[in-house]
């Protein structure tokens, strides 16, 4: 499987690695967690742009580090800016996490944006970079994916994580992998050898076939996701009180419900909003505050168009009841 991963990075990202620069874990989560356990000491800070995937902060805390959040609002497309990154870095900063395309927002960094962030990091040589690329192949509108390890001078301190769950719909097979500096990969290997050992050999064999096989279906599937995204975003923006940016990747949207909070009902925040939506209309979404940004909620459109149409009608009815 390491050979398949090496070929993937060379084929798709023009990155060259050797087998001692590759780790394979029981899902991307284990790879991330092992990396933090291997590198964090008490007091070390990990910069986490918010909104963020919910597991990042707890992984850092479990490893003895300190999560430091950088608010990236709707006005910035939910993306980190060089100015905010520069301001957040201190002598205690050990890692910066970059996730593109993003869970929960679907925001994706362009090559130009990645290079701009890279210029800040080039000046801060003690900061490691964790690039979570798990949604690399779920992208739309001819978006050109670029990962920060492609900046030559940053490659040696970048850990690039990916996996088969999102690209190949193999979530339950639990195969994640990463490429990075030999010393960090070796430390990750030590931790994994004393905890879970190797991932399932059956899953490894399946992942090899996925990585080495034809990739043509990925674009076809992205078209289906794109159609659902367009429908959901356009419908949400037609609902008074709701606004929603058009994401460039992943299979989530992150609409604002600020215009519906504090109206004639007792809904005071996004948590109240999603709770009442579930109670009144049986639609399950996740509050933005769970991802570090209040006043929003996340919808996954990784389901059928039929179910999405029903959900949108129910969300509209619920929102109208709050006006």
Regions found by a protein language model. Give the residues of each.
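A structural motif shared across PLP-dependent enzymes of the aminotransferase-like
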Residues: 1-7, 101, 199
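N-terminal Rossmann-like NAD(P)+-binding subdomain of aldehyde/semialdehyde dehydrogenases
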Residues: 4, 12-13
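Basic, alpha-helical helix-turn-helix
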Residues: 9-10, 28
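PLP-dependent class I/II
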Residues: 15-19, 23-323
């Amino acid at each position: 499987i390491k050979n398949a991963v090496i070929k993937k990075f060379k084929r798709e990202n023009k990155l060259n690695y050797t087998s001692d620069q590759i780790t394979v874990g029981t899902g991307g989560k284990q790879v991330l967690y092992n990396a933090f356990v291997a590198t964090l000491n008490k007091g070390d800070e990990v910069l986490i742009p918010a909104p963020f995937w919910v597991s990042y902060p707890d992984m850092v805390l479990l490893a003895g580090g300190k999560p430091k959040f950088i608010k990236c609002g709707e006005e910035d497309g939910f993306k980190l800016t060089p100015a905010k990154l520069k301001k957040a870095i201190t002598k205690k900063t050990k890692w910066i996490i970059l996730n593109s395309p993003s869970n929960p927002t679907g925001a994706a960094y362009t090559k130009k944006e990645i290079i701009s962030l890279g210029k800040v990091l080039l000046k801060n040589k003690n900061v490691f970079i964790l690039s979570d690329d798990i949604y690399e192949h779920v992208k739309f509108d001819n978006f050109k994916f670029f990962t920060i390890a492609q900046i030559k001078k940053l490659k040696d301190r970048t850990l690039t994580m990916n996996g088969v769950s999102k690209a190949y719909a193999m979530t339950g097979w639990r195969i994640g992998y990463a490429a990075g500096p030999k010393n960090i990969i070796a430390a990750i290997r030590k931790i994994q050898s004393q905890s879970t050992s190797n991932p399932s050999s059956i899953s490894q064999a399946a992942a090899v076939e996925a990585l080495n096989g034809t990739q043509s279906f990925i674009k076809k599937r992205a078209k289906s996701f794109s159609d659902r995204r367009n429908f959901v975003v356009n419908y949400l923006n037609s609902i008074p009180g709701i606004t929603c940016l058009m994401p460039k990747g992943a299979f989530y949207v992150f609409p604002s419900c600020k215009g519906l909070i504090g109206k004639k009902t007792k809904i005071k925040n996004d948590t109240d909003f999603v709770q009442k939506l579930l109670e009144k209309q049986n639609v399950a979404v996740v509050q933005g505050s769970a991802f570090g940004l209040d006043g929003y909620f996340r919808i996954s459109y990784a389901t059928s168009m039929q179910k999405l149409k029903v959900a949108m009608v129910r969300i509209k009815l619920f929102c109208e009841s709050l006006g």
